[in-house]
Structure formats: C-alpha cells, structure tokens
Amino acid sequence: MKSTLVAAVLLATAAAATAQQPSSAFDRGHSLQAFQDPGLSAVTARCKTPPPTRPARPGAGTAAGSEAPPAPALPKPDAIPGVIAAGQNWKVVWAWEGNNADGPIAAEDGSILFANNDAGNVMKLDPATGLATILFDGTNTGGGLSRSKNGALFLATRGLGGGIEQLEPQRRMFANTFQGEPLECVGGSVNDLVADARGGVYLAISGAGVFYANPKGVMSRYDGAPNANGIILSQDEKTLYVTNGGVVVAFDVHADGSLTNLREFGKLRGGQGGDGAAIDSDGRLYVATGASADVFSPAGDFLGSIPGPRGMHGVAFGGKDKKTLFGIVFYGGWGTPSARNQIVAIPLLAKGYAGRAK
C-alpha cells in the first residue's frame, strides 16, 4: 500500500514526519537482516545441508555511541572524456540515520527511488527539494531495487524469509526459496537484484553467488562469483555484470535467462571492492567501490575513477535528463546508533540508459 505521508528531509540533518517515528524506524531491532535475527538458527537447523558459518560483520558492535560521526569529505573529481567534465562537485541531497538508503533507481519524473534497510520501507526522493515520500512500508528489510523494461518493480528483501518481493504492478512475494528450501539455507546475505524484460530477476547473494528467478519464481544457481554484490544487465540484456570483490565478472545471458561463459570483465581500482553498479546510454559500466565510481567501457577497458565520499556503496543515474549520477553513502558504526547515510549527486556528461530505470 502506498503512503501519502511525506517525509520532509533536511539536506544535512535527520528530520522527518512519517508513518514511522525515527525513534522506532531507526532502532536496530526494528527491521533486522536475516543474519541479525535470533530466529535464524531455528530456520537453518531445518536445512537439508547446513549453510556455511557466516563470519562476523566488520565493524558490527563498535561505535556504541549515538553521536553522529563527521560526514565524509566530498572530493572533487578530475575530468574523464565523455563521462564527466572538470570542475564538477558532489552535493548532498538527502541524509538520515541508521543503515538506510540502498538500491537507488531512477523514476521517470527525475526523482529517485531507494530502499531503507532499518526503516523497512521504500521512498521516493525529489533531489531538488529533499522531500521524500514513503511509497511502500513493511518491506522485511528491503535493500536493492530494480524496475524491468516492462515496468515491474522488484525489491531484494534481507530479513528472515526474504528474497525477491514484487512491489508493482501487484505486491507479492516473487521468490524466496531454492530447491524447496528458504534462501537462508544457501548461506550468505541477500544483496542486490536486477529484473529482465522476460519477467525474471537475477539476485546476488553475497557469500552464495548468483541466482536467477524465472518468470514463475523458480530459482537456479550459478557458481563462480561467491562474493557477488552489485548486479546489472547490459542495455541489450545479453550480458550480466556482477561485482565480485576486487573484480567485475560477466556472464552471457541466453533467451531462457540461463547464464554461461563466466569471465573476468575488469579489475576495480579504487576503494574497498565492488558494490552497486549502473550503466549509461553508451554501455559504459559504473561501479561503486566504497570511495569512488570506477568506469569501464563496454569492452572492459578501465576509463577512470570518479572519486566520491568515503562509504559510497551504490550508484544510479537520475534527474530529468538522466545526466546526474547519484551515490549512496554509509558511514559511522555499522549496526550501531552512530550509523548514518547520505545520498549525493554530481552532474555528468554521460547520460544514463533510458530503456530501464537503472
């Protein structure tokens, strides 16, 4: 159900009037990821094969105070021919508390949709005013968003029993099992997704690899990218790009959605490994690395890095002409009251691919 309540979000502060009060919406126990949920052990105890033990999340349990840490600096990028002109600057267009702001995608009116993990909702942001409307609530710790060429909207849900939820044209669970068992049985963490034009969805589960849910929601698994994180299709949907640690890998995509020919596409140069990705109208690939957006040609040639704020873990094209690159930024102590997030934006020469939201 869509909410007509509007969150008035100040550009550099946390202030809102929403269906969820900040005291509850950003409480660490409000919307848990599966690995944080005390009920996880009961679910995995019923798996036919126990999933691998999950390592502790770096930074979890630190920075116990709730005081906001200093916001990361906004570096000034150099020019990259055809991509970004010299003299452009990042600006903050949204900021709030918690482990929020993930999976950004463009809307046709120039706004940005994004998911809030801790708050468990999906919001629509007008970057010009900082006003954000809650579109969907109760998302079971929603993360990545994707809209197919046909207009269907999907969300990667990271809570216990999560997987792929369809939000539009009707809201329903699309896929959350593999070979008859919950996705918790494969191990890892649901991370990102991309929807194709045939009605299926590719899902990256960090620690488990790449999965494809066909139009009926039946899932197949593809090995070779155990650290799968960001995931995006090429313009013609014949290539699937997946960030896998310090590299980007690619698969050939077949008419039935199956994947073959896993190969290394490019090595990342900046930051802490690859995360969310986007493509532009010329087929270039942009990958968030934790401190930059690394840019590659369609052939896999490294074209340069657009340095961004420390903690930038996802990118998307948006704006009325789709020539603005938006970045999502996390800083502070992960899983603690000091956690903070931002959405930042910078104008580019390049234009995002118009045939899909991302």
Regions found by a protein language model. Give the residues of each.
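Sequence-structural signature of mature extracellular/luminal beta-sheet repeat domains
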Residues: 20-358
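C-terminal, active-site-flanking charged/polar segments
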Residues: 17
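Sec-dependent signal peptide recognition
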Residues: 2-8
